[in-house]
Amino acid sequence: AFGQGVSVTALQQVTAVSAAINGGTLYKPYIMKRVVEHETGQIIKEVKPTVIRDNIITEDTSEQVRMTLESVVSLGTGRNAYIDGYRIGGKTGTAQKVNNGVYMQGNYIVSFIGFLPANDPKLVVYLAIDNPKGITQYGGTVSAPIVKNIMEDAIVALGIEKQDGGTEKEYQWYDKKYYTVENVIGLTKKEATSILKNFSIEYSGSGNNVISQSPEAGSRIVEGENVR
């Protein structure tokens, strides 16, 4: 999405998107979930969800929104937020900034909002960066990869399991490719080179035989990385 300016807070953005993907219910946002006694673990206070308005959109419409936003991550501008094995939806944003009533050239707020699992959302992450330096200013290239990193950590913390049925990522020519490192320990230098040269990665070493390797076999690396 490309727009002129940003007129909502991050919390307002998350609240609105949450209503669009949860079946159409607008909830009052809150920061604190519960207060727990440090030593005993006893719950002193717990905040319950408060409905502001129900049926803002129908469940069918909400499902279509989720499906569409999932395709943004697998097929569209949000591919940098894709995580293998997880159904993720999201939307990129690029908003031109205003100064003294005039839209500024080359000065943007770039953002990405992502959620997972796309078919039954449990987590929403929104990130906006004001005028990033030294990089192409698009939400899909700047903000989406950071949201991906946050969601990867959240997946572990929340115990969200992988699931089947999502849309596989469609790679474009400008996407970086990932490879699984082959096991070349025990091979000669010539044998190892013949295997590694089939991938767009760097490799280096000394001697005539491979006695160790880094990263270890089975690791995932991005094109251009070095195997030693």
Model-based region annotation:
Residues G85, N99, L127-R228:
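Ligand-recognition elements built from short beta-strands and adjacent flexible loops
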